[in-house]
Amino acid sequence: MMNHTPLLLGIRERLIFALDVPSRTQALEWIDQLGDAISFYKIGMELLASGEYFQVLDDLASRGKRVFVDLKFFDIPATVAGVIRRLSQWPISYCTIHGWHAPMMQAATEANTSNMHLLAVTVLTSMTREDLAKMGINREPVDVVVERALAAHMAGMSGVIASGQEAAAIRRAVGSGFSIVCPGIRTNHVPHNDQQRTIGIKAAFANGADAIVVGRPIRMAQDPQAAAEAMQTEIMTALTEPST
C-alpha cells in the first residue's frame, strides 16, 4: 500500500531525538531523562546490534512516543519488500530506505500494509562533493539529492532524509505533501563531528523541513532536557513567526 501522504506531526513532534545508544538500559535512561521534552525517537543500527531493538521499540510505543526506525535498508527489491511487510506489524511512524534504486523503493511502498511512512535516504549529511566524486558521482550534492527525492516521490515514498541545506531545492522540485526530515542539525558551539552539510534549526525550517533529527547536540549538553526544550521553543518560533 503506497503511503504518499506525509505524516501529520504535532508541533512538538518535529524534534526527533537520535537514540544512538548500545543497550536498552541506556535507552530507557535517556527516555526517562528527557521526559516530555521529546515525543519522537529515532532508533538505529547501534541499538539493533544489542539484540534489544524491538524491546526498545515497544518501550517507546508503550510510553506514547513516536518511533523512527532508521536502518537504511538497501538490498534487492524482494528482500526490502519482505522486511517492510514484517515491519508493518509494528507501531512505527518513520522507516528509512536508501534512495539509490527506484525499483527497490517501489517494492517497499507496495509492501507497506500499515500507516508506517517510508523515507528515502538521499545523500548522507556526512558526505561532501569530494566524497561523491570518489564514488564516480561528479555532481553537486544538491543535484543528487533532488534527483533522488524526485525518484522517491514517483515511487510513492512519503518523503526523504536530506540535509536542511537542500530542503528548499527539494521543496521547489517536489512541492508540498512530501516530508523532508533533516539530520545534521548543529547549534552554536556544538562541534560538527563527522557531519559535513550542517544547518541550524531556524534555517532548516525556513528551507522547508518538516522535522529535524538531533542527537549529539542534546546528548552532549550539560542539561539535555533543557537543551531539548530550548530547541522545541526555537522550532515553535520558526514555524509561527511571519516569514520575511
Curated annotation (Swiss-Prot):
SUPFAM superfamilies according to UniProt: Ribulose-phoshate binding barrel
InterPro entries xrefs: Aldolase_TIM, OMPdecase, OMPdecase_AS, OMPdecase_bac, OMPdeCOase_dom, RibuloseP-bd_barrel
Catalytic activity reported: orotidine 5'-phosphate + H(+) = UMP + CO2
Binding site for substrate: 20, 42, 70-79, 125, 186, 195, 215-216
Disulfide bonds: none
Annotated catalytic residues: 72 (proton donor)
Molecular-function GO term, any one: orotidine-5'-phosphate decarboxylase activity
Top-level taxon of the source organism: Bacteria
Keyword hit for Lyase: yes
Gene Ontology terms describing biological process: 'de novo' pyrimidine nucleobase biosynthetic process; 'de novo' UMP biosynthetic process
GO cellular component terms given for this protein: cytosol
EC number(s) recorded for this UniProt protein: 4.1.1.23
Pfam families named among the record's database cross-references: OMPdecase
Pathway entry: Pyrimidine metabolism; UMP biosynthesis via de novo pathway; UMP from orotate: step 2/2
Keywords: Decarboxylase, Lyase, Pyrimidine biosynthesis
The keyword Lyase is assigned to this record: yes
HAMAP family: OMPdecase_type1_B (MF_01200_B)
Similarity field: Belongs to the OMP decarboxylase family. Type 1 subfamily.
Quaternary state and interactors: Homodimer.
The protein's role, per its UniProt record: Catalyzes the decarboxylation of orotidine 5'-monophosphate (OMP) to uridine 5'-monophosphate (UMP).
Protein name: Orotidine 5'-phosphate decarboxylase
The species this protein was found in: Xylella fastidiosa (strain M12)
Gene name, Swiss-Prot/TrEMBL: pyrF
